């Protein structure tokens, strides 16, 4: 661990969106960063910004988390110890499961699930030895509600279930874990996935700062499942209380459940 100096947070996917929001918020709280994504130019620009605005130092790891080598490089860095890990990199796709490119589906599973598993496994031993550390795994409300897309929702359900199970196992170790479950957030996500969001009502949109602020406050409060926004807290609660076949129908009708993987 790095307690003698500034604490260090490793964030996957900070080249845009929620990950960039975590990087700015944590740099503002005094962390140095390890920035992990494919777009080196974006990571270098962020590192410069974090240095100028907050005096934070950043290591840049420009790797593809869909590859074995990419994940191995991050695992090796985590084994040397970090104070916080934010498993945020992830993506969705459009089209139906049965016509989607199998290679793309596999890389989605590798980024959204395998990387979360391997990076968490790599970070924990040093944290447990130190008796402290934080891991935020970015899931989605899509992982809480049935009937909204297939592989993306399944990947996020894995992240929720994995993180909640892990929280039980880590009780008493001093290490905190959180499954962050945002609804729609204004980032590059939907454009990259090719998802048309033009008919999504304003009330369903969250902004990155709100999501990051809620996550960090919930971490301090010891909440394992963090759901930013009152509208999504209500939806998630309703999703547990209403019969699941009705939830499936509603999410397919109002959530445009077809054409998603
Ligand atoms: N936006 C939403 O409505 C929403 C809602 C719920 C949950 N989420 C989740 O929030 C997380 C962040 O998404 P976002 O909304 O901030 O989207 P975004 O702006 O598209 O950012 C995604 C990040 O993931 C990184 N990434 C994607 N594939 C990668 C790969 N193969 N290797 C390494 N990094 C990779 C991207 O970096 P590079 O392209 O540089 O590699 C980028 O930094 C995701 O896990 C997403 O599922 C988003």
Tell what function each PLM region has.
Residues 15-17:
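Conserved glycine-rich cofactor-binding loop
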Residues 29-46:
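Conserved glycine-rich Rossmann-like NAD(P)H-binding loop of the short-chain dehydrogenase/reductase
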Residues 88-93:
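Conserved NAD(P)H cofactor-binding loop of Rossmann-fold oxidoreductase domains
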Residues 96-107:
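Substrate-binding pocket helix/loop in short-chain dehydrogenase/reductase
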Residues 120, 155:
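Active-site helix of classical SDR
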Residues 140:
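Residue(s) in the substrate-gating loop at a strand-loop-helix junction
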Residues 179, 199-235:
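C-terminal helical subdomain
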């Amino acid at each position: 661990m790095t307690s003698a100096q500034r604490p260090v947070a490793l964030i996957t996917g900070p080249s845009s969106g929620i990950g960039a929001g975590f990087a700015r918020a944590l740099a503002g709280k005094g962390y140095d960063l390890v920035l992990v994504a494919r777009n080196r130019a974006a990571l270098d620009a962020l590192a410069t910004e974090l240095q100028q605005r907050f005096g934070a130092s950043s290591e840049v790891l420009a790797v593809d988390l869909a590859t074995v080598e990419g994940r191995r490089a991050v695992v090796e860095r985590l084994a040397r110890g970090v104070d916080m890990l934010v498993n945020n990199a992830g993506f969705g796709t459009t089209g139906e499961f049965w016509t989607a490119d199998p290679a793309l589906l596999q890389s989605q599973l590798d980024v959204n699930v395998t990387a979360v598993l391997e990076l968490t496994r790599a970070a924990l031993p040093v944290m447990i030895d130190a008796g402290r550390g934080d891991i935020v795994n970015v899931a989605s409300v899509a992982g809480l509600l049935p009937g909204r897309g297939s592989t993306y929702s399944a990947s996020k359900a894995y992240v929720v279930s994995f993180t909640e199970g892990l929280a039980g196992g880590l009780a008493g170790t001093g290490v905190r874990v959180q499954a962050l479950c945002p609804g729609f957030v204004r980032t590059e996500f939907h454009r990259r996935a090719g998802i048309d969001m033009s008919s999504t009502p304003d009330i369903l949109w969250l902004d990155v700062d709100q999501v990051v602020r809620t996550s960090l406050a919930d971490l301090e409060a010891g909440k394992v499942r963090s759901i930013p926004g009152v509208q999504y807290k209500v939806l998630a609660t309703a999703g547990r209380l209403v019969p699941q076949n009705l939830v499936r129908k509603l999410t397919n009708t109002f959530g445009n459940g077809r054409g998603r993987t």
